[in-house]
């Protein structure tokens, strides 16, 4: 894989933030309120998987992964 630019890394980090926000909003009942439990669970599971993959990448510099790791833990404990 080619080296990522700083802009590409920033885009990945922003996308991770979107996953964090969505996981937290679903758990708080602020997102997907009209969806059934299976859809909410699937969405949380997919976003947790995305975060797990991205946190493990070796191209990160000084980016703070605290929110991502917290969302992973919260999502793993979530049952819709």
Residue spans of the language-model regions?
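N-terminal acidic leader/helix
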Residues: 3-28
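N-terminal start and proteolytic maturation junction detector
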Residues: 12, 24, 56, 70-72
């Amino acid at each position: 894989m080619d080296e990522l630019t700083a802009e590409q890394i920033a885009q990945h980090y922003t996308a991770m933030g979107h996953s964090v926000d969505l996981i937290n909003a679903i758990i708080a009942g602020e997102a997907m309120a009209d969806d059934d439990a299976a859809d909410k669970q699937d969405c949380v599971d997919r976003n947790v998987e995305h975060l797990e993959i991205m946190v493990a990448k070796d191209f990160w510099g000084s980016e703070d992964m605290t929110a991502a790791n917290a969302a992973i833990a919260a999502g793993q404990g979530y049952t819709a």
